[in-house]
Amino acid sequence: MTMTDPLGDMLTRIRNGAARRKSSVSTPASSLRARVLDVLQSEGYIRGYSKVDFENGKAEFTIELKYYEGASVIREIGRVSKPGRRVYVSVKSIPQVANGLGITILSTPKGVMADHQAREQNVGGEVLCSVF
C-alpha cells in the first residue's frame, strides 16, 4: 500500500503515541523523516530515535517520546504543507508558534531546520510542520 504523505503519517504516529502515553513509536525510515527527527531531538521534543534495518532491505525508526511530570512534551504537532497544498514562506514571513514557545520546521535550500535557525541563516522554504 502506498502512502501519500509519509511525513504526515510519522507526525500522526508521534501524536497518537503521546496521547496513549507510549514510551516509543515506530515508523518506516526515510531521509526526510530522519532530518525532521534530528530537529525534534535537538529542540528537546523527543528523547531520541534509532534506526532498525531488516533483512528485506527496509528500515524503521523507533522514536523515544519525551515526558515531563507525566505529560507529553509535545502538546500539538501538525503538518502545515501537505502534498495537495504546499506552503512556502520567505524569511520575513516564517510563522511563530505560540509566540515563540513552539517551533516551525522548514525544508530550506540549506537543509531541514527549525524556524529560529532559518531566521539566523536568512533563508525561507517549505513549512513542513509546527510543534508546540
UniProtKB/Swiss-Prot annotation:
InterPro entries: Ribosomal_uS8, Ribosomal_uS8_CS, Ribosomal_uS8_sf. One of the primary rRNA binding proteins, it binds directly to 16S rRNA central domain where it helps coordinate assembly of the platform of the 30S subunit. Keywords: Ribonucleoprotein, Ribosomal protein, RNA-binding, rRNA-binding. GO terms for cellular component: ribonucleoprotein complex; ribosome. GO terms for molecular function: rRNA binding; structural constituent of ribosome. This is Small ribosomal subunit protein uS8. It comes from the Bacteria. Part of the 30S ribosomal subunit. Contacts proteins S5 and S12. The keyword Ribonucleoprotein applies. One of its GO terms (biological process) is translation. Belongs to the universal ribosomal protein uS8 family. It holds the Pfam family Ribosomal_S8.
